[in-house]
């Protein structure tokens, strides 16, 4: 009847709206990094620049958070994630949190060197956070010298991330998620995905390649030209993302956000992308 159908449609709409809200609330970083704690030092001149972060959020649909799996089931999740790390020859350290498990390639010690982290939830939703690879002081000085030699002016306190090194870190960590779902025989079509950029605004890509030097001489520096933001949510069961891979998605969206011209028809753009993927060294400054 009409009223019954109308009531059913209202209920379906309400459920869909609630699920979208759950996904939006999920898509925010919850793994702690030292910069999340306000600095209490009065000397602001000694504070370090905020660490650029890229986070990938994968929300598993069709399961309710209230449906907590058994301990045996959760242990099988840990075994699978450890196996994913082992398959890539990476060490795996597990930290328990209040409603998730955090997997790192090194021991998580507050205030120590910052590393990537995967947060795994009981329903097998996942969050990946990858810090950009910042240049050390020597490399920063060398980058500024080489850029100046190209008659490009950048401020002395400009923030750089190593293009090839960061790409390798992002794709290597995202590959762990691909391995995990294969080991668990889960389809990516069960997930909704979004990504987030933090402390990335104005951060420049740097590479010691001849191709990069030529490119920035013609087009200027590549850098993140937007403020920190979170992407739209993509539903991987939409028929478009049947070949989705976390590795490819994370790598391409991170570097496109940094100004890298991915998918461009230009030969010059494609030559640059290939050079950064290879990480071929330059002879500049030698």
Put a short name on every predicted segment.
Residues 1-286:
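Bergerat-fold GHKL/Histidine-kinase-like ATPase
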């Amino acid at each position: 009847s009409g009223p019954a159908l109308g009531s059913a449609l209202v209920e379906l709409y309400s459920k869909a709206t609630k699920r979208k809200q759950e996904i939006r609330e999920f898509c925010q970083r919850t793994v702690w990094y030292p910069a999340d704690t306000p600095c209490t030092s009065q000397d602001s001149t000694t504070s370090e620049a905020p660490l650029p972060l890229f986070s990938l959020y994968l929300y598993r649909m069709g399961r309710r958070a209230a449906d907590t799996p058994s301990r045996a089931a959760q242990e099988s999740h840990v075994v699978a994630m450890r196996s994913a790390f082992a398959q890539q020859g990476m060490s795996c350290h597990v930290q328990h949190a209040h409603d998730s498990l955090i997997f790192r390639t090194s021991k998580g010690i507050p205030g120590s060197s910052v590393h990537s982290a995967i947060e795994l939830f009981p329903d097998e939703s996942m969050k990946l956070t990858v810090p950009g690879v910042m240049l050390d002081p020597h490399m920063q000085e060398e980058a500024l010298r080489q850029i100046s030699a190209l008659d490009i002016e950048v401020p002395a306190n400009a923030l750089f991330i190593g293009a090839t090194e960061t790409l390798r870190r992002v794709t290597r960590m995202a590959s762990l998620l691909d391995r995990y779902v294969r080991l668990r025989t889960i389809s990516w079509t069960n997930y909704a995905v979004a990504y987030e950029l933090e402390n990335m605004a104005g951060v420049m890509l740097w590479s010691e390649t001849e191709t990069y030097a030529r490119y920035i001489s013609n087009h200027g520096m590549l850098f993140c030209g937007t403020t920190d933001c979170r992407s739209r949510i993509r539903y991987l069961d939409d028929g478009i993302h049947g070949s989705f891979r976390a590795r490819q998605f994370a790598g391409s969206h991170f570097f496109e956000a940094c100004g890298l011209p991915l998918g461009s028809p230009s030969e010059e753009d494609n030559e640059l992308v290939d050079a950064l993927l290879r990480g071929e060294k330059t002879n500049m400054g030698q």
